[in-house]
UniProtKB/Swiss-Prot annotation:
Similarity-based family: Belongs to the class-II aminoacyl-tRNA synthetase family.
Known cofactor(s): Zn(2+)
InterPro entries: aa-tRNA-synth_II/BPL/LPL, Ala-tRNA-lgiase_IIc, Ala-tRNA-ligase_IIc_anticod-bd, Ala-tRNA-synth_IIc_core, Ala-tRNA-synth_IIc_N, Ala-tRNA_ligase, Ala_tRNA_ligase_euk/bac, DHHA1_dom
Cofactor notes: Binds 1 zinc ion per subunit.
EC number of this enzyme: 6.1.1.7
Gene Ontology MF terms: alanine-tRNA ligase activity; aminoacyl-tRNA deacylase activity; ATP binding; tRNA binding; zinc ion binding
Function description: Catalyzes the attachment of alanine to tRNA(Ala) in a two-step reaction: alanine is first activated by ATP to form Ala-AMP and then transferred to the acceptor end of tRNA(Ala). Also edits incorrectly charged Ser-tRNA(Ala) and Gly-tRNA(Ala) via its editing domain.
Alphabetical list of CDD domains matching this protein: AlaRS_core (cd00673)
Protein name as it appears in the record: Alanine--tRNA ligase
Lineage of producing organism: Bacteria, Pseudomonadati, Bacteroidota, Bacteroidia, Bacteroidales
Keywords attached to this entry: Aminoacyl-tRNA synthetase, ATP-binding, Cytoplasm, Ligase, Metal-binding, Nucleotide-binding, Protein biosynthesis, RNA-binding, tRNA-binding, Zinc
Amino acid sequence: MLTAKETRDSFKNFFESKGHQIVPSAPMVIKDDPTLMFTNAGMNQFKDIILGNHPAKYHRVADSQKCLRVSGKHNDLEEVGHDTYHHTMFEMLGNWSFGDYFKKEAISWAWEYLVDVLKLNPEHLYATVFEGSPEEGLERDNEAASYWEQYLPKDHIINGNKHDNFWEMGDTGPCGPCSEIHIDLRPAEERAKISGRDLVNHDHPQVIEIWNLVFMQYNRKADSTLEPLPAKVIDTGMGFERLCMALQGKTSNYDTDVFQPLIKAIAQMAGTEYGKNEQNDIAMRVIADHIRTIAFSITDGQLPSNAKAGYVIRRILRRAVRYGYTFLGQKQAFMYKLLPVLIDSMGDAYPELIAQKELIEKVIKEEEESFLRTLETGIRLLDKTMADTKANGKTEISGKDAFTLYDTFGFPLDLTELILRENGMTVNVEEFDAEMQQQKQRARNAAAIETGDWIILKEGTTEFVGYDYTEYETSILRYRQVKQKNQTLYQIVLDYTPFYAESGGQVGDTGVLVNEFETIEVIDTKKENNLPIHITKKLPEHPEAPMMACVDTDKRAACAANHSATHLLDEALREVLGEHVEQKGSLVTPDSLRFDFSHFQKVTDEELRKVEHLVNAKIRANVPLQEHRNIPIEEAKELGAIALFGEKYGDHVRVIQFGSSIEFCGGTHVAATGNIGMVKIISESSVAAGVRRIEAYTGARVEEMLDTIQDTLSDLKALFNNTPDLGVAIRKYIDENAGLKKQVEDFMKEKEAAVKERLLKNVQEINGIKVIKFCLPMPAEVVKNIAFQLRGEITENLFFVAGTVDANKPMLTVMISDNLVAGGLKAGNLVKEAAKLIQGGGGGQPHFATAGGKNPDGLNAAVEKVLELAGI
């Protein structure tokens, strides 16, 4: 029986023997494709080749790619753990041909690998082929079928519809028929009863797809029509975990050596055993799956956060924590303890797990602890919601309340339902679903983009010349229209461009495109699948005319200074804090720089000062730039160049060197460090567990900041009569102010006590109820304090109503003792109605409520209205 590691190696060895270049997995987190947050298929790293944006370096390629499917079209999240074969993070074994071999070889080698190398039983294999589509004018894929007939009986070759057997990259782009290979893993007696043919693509857990061979031969245009691709592409993907299940004779991916070490560790933590309780088993499968996703995302540079890809990772982590909390009794952080087990099983194939072990553990632990606190808060809010619902004689809480718990506190619906069931209550699921759909629709509307077809003026690829030029003669290769949020923009591709496209943390260049007829402003430059795209608000009237591409040199120079400063900052941080410091992110703009790095405690003021001094010393030394352009990656490593985790590097790289600072980098930089001028750190903060952030200014921005500080200092000196020792004067002022504040607080307490005593002497007893009412100018906090003090002294039959004015704003306050609340009085209902008389509104709890308004003249009437509504 092959282990997971042996299976992975055998695939690579087989395709290497067929002339394929074995390439490393690309990062799971995508940085230069606006259509994707995560790598969700093996082909993602080759999109620029498939789209024709860049020539293929190798015409035959194979790899094992880390993938993540949790959002968009490929969304497996809710199925994960509930079945035997869906996952969030998974490995995709794949082989590709870019204009080389096509269907015959792809099918032949797939069969050879599965049957001759892995020794899978050919009688248990089925292949699907595209049945055709009359509405698309597409015939059955008879070519693929004819090749399959060389290996399989005809009853093992199944026609598949467009949904199952026509693969598309998206709404537009390369596409084509595909041929899926399915395997029947059922026992012999089951196979004898029902043919596997009848179960293919019917979600049977033991008749599953293991390999998809995609034959890309068309391009889908924006008008939905198809045109032939100039160069045909083979793109295959085989689910590694499913293949291991088939080879190891298991009925579930989770029973293989890919997941079992994790599941056993989880079971041990929970004091249970896998296979004894289905709900517990689901929880263990969820956690085993999700810990892989979270760990690999962090190694690839994506930390949990509240935005975009970071929010997806946080959501996955919280889903795992919630399953552990709800079903396995894990009330403390536990997932971070699984990392050594994950490293033991996958560290050899993915050494980045080992290199970043400490960071991954700290991030996961802090995220767990934060969410557990949130869960406790959510439970308290749910307890209050249940109490209020019961007080109103109901047993069903509203879906809106449940959605607020979910949306604001990350409190999942199934946990809400579980707690409600334990208390004999339910939730209105239809209302919850309606709220969820409204939120999704709002998100879809906000993100909706209409992208037109490329208008191709001439074929070609873009050459970036921006390292050497800021102006360059060029022409347009293609353009298209893009609509988003009621704005129409244009994306332009040039044959030569000096414009730097946003990447590596550095924002894109701006500038103009100039020809003899007009000037077009370039408002941004982005990368899409490594293709530089120039964004404009209008198109040239003569797009075929030659033009000059001119970069805004002031902004470029400011960006270059800030980017070079991040390199110096990185080196200085490692010198001051230690070699554990690694860059975790950056943002380089013309105005400032932001640098995220691994460090496990706050950087002290003294350490920041040392860092700043080291950077500025190197600036004063005016160290010249040494650019190593397009050198072999091994040569770069020999230089000692620092690479970033989560970045994908080619065989040849660019290295930026300022003396002892040596880094892989594709950004723009100053010719010598003296051009930076000066660096001033303006803030240091925490981004996530184990990750700190420094923000800084350079050059002219430092001068502006120093000017502002000097002006502020001058104003302060003037306020203190130009005293020679401003610090002493300010401290004296603060101390005196604190003393006066204390006197005011003491006075207010005396006033509160006096008012309370006066009110106690003037209690009116009406039908056995002790009524205290008044209208006075008084701060809201004082009224509240008095009300609660009175409630403590008059424990039964207290009815307190006050109309007060503070800063010309009227306030209505009602306090009721518990026995009156039990009798049916509700303070919140009373103030809500009476507040109309002061042109306001409010509410609160049954025993205490307040309302604000705009009309102080209505206070007396409002107080009387409260008494009237209460029947007093």
